[in-house]
Regions:
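Core SAM-dependent methyltransferase catalytic element
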Residues: 253-318
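Conserved AdoMet
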Residues: 1-102
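Conserved class I S-adenosyl-L-methionine
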Residues: 97-109, 114, 132-134
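Conserved beta-strand signature within the Rossmann-like core of class I S-adenosyl-L-methionine
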Residues: 234-242
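Conserved SAM-binding loop of SAM-dependent methyltransferases across substrates and taxa
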Residues: 108-126
Length: 338
């Protein structure tokens, strides 16, 4: 089965970019055995089935992707969206068209729904007019869960009960997202290695691509970034997970530092005229270093929603930015990847 396994691994990487190494091989072998048994075929025949049956290939990929996520993950980046990026884009747009936001690799929907809730707290019911939210993932199973929008306690790590009661209805041991939030996100299958995407997956102002690139090697990450650029408007912004950002500085897009946070910008980005915002041109020689694994626990990251829910502190009441001398610089931060 070793030669068949190697061929299957190569097929998976070619079609969707997933690199299966080390511990992932055990998961692959288990999935292959289970699927061969379910189809009543020999494991040696499974590769041929994968090549000819797109639905079966998707079923296998669904079993190989890890979809651990939760609401208001990395709240400082959501704060960046609500307090900085969204107001800036909306001011430039002057109400002519909604701001399009993509959650790429959205898993079961916690990320895009978190973005909706955070923006609803600031803009109220105007969110439906001001924004267009899309969630995309290669895993059709988790997309079905996202559309269903029913969650367990596991998705609310550190999220205060007031948030759940405001945006969710409790049903036995689960929480069902309220319709006014659920209806604002449209979910679509998204293969980031595909050469072309449908119109609904194009022309985004802001793309969140967080905690996904850890599954890909450096060449694949660069290809994915190049494909994401194609989905962005000329002044679009790409937000990558905090622990992944510097390892994704691959020469595709300029890296921006704003108030101690990093994101990538395309073309002539909408940047504030402040000394705390710096734009660095693309690297000419990307760093080959692997992505560092985040060690911060969920409990150490208070949910962004805690600062935004009705009756609590509004964005205008948030503490002032960190003093300039306490903010990381691009130079010092990049040393982490060398």
């Amino acid at each position: 089965m070793s030669s068949d396994t190697g061929a299957i691994k190569a097929l998976i990487k070619a079609r969707c970019g997933l690199s299966i190494e080390d511990n992932g091989e055990g998961l692959l072998l288990q999935a292959l055995t289970e699927r061969a048994k379910a189809l009543a075929i020999q494991t040696a025949s499974y590769y041929a089935r994968l090549v000819s049956d797109e639905a079966e290939f998707q079923e296998l990929v669904n079993r190989l992707t890890v979809n651990e996520t939760y609401f208001f993950r990395e709240p400082e980046q959501i704060r960046l969206l609500v307090d900085r990026l969204a107001p800036r884009f909306l001011a430039a747009r002057e109400g002519q068209a909604p701001l399009r936001i993509l959650s790429a690799g959205c898993s079961s929907g916690e990320e895009p729904y978190s973005l909706v809730m955070a923006l609803m707290d600031r803009y109220g019911q105007s969110v439906s007019r001001l924004f267009d939210f899309v969630g995309g993932d290669i895993d059709s199973t988790v997309l079905a869960k996202a559309r269903h929008a029913r969650y367990t306690e596991f998705s609310f790590r550190g999220v205060p009960a007031s948030v759940r009661s405001h945006y969710f209805d409790k049903d036995c041991q689960t929480y069902v997202l309220k319709p006014e939030v659920k209806k604002l996100v449209h979910f679509h299958e998204l293969n980031l290695l595909a050469d072309n995407q449908p119109t609904v997956l194009q022309d985004f102002d802001i793309i969140f691509f967080r905690n996904v690139s850890i599954y890909f090697d450096t060449p694949t990450r660069k290809t994915i970034q190049q494909n994401l650029v194609k989905l962005m408007k000329d002044d679009g912004v790409l937000v990558i997970g905090t622990a992944e950002t510097l390892a994704n500085d691959l020469g595709v897009l300029p890296l921006v530092q704003e108030d101690g946070l990093f994101y990538f910008a395309k073309g002539q980005p909408l940047l504030p005229e402040t000394s705390s915002c710096k734009l660095r041109p693309q690297r000419t020689t990307p760093s080959p270093k692997p992505i560092p694994q985040a060690t911060t626990t969920a409990s150490a990251q208070p949910p962004f929603a805690k600062l935004l829910i009705p009756g609590v502190r509004r964005p205008s009441e948030l503490a002032s930015p960190v003093p300039q001398d306490q903010k990381p610089t691009l130079t010092s931060a990049r040393q982490l990847t060398h």
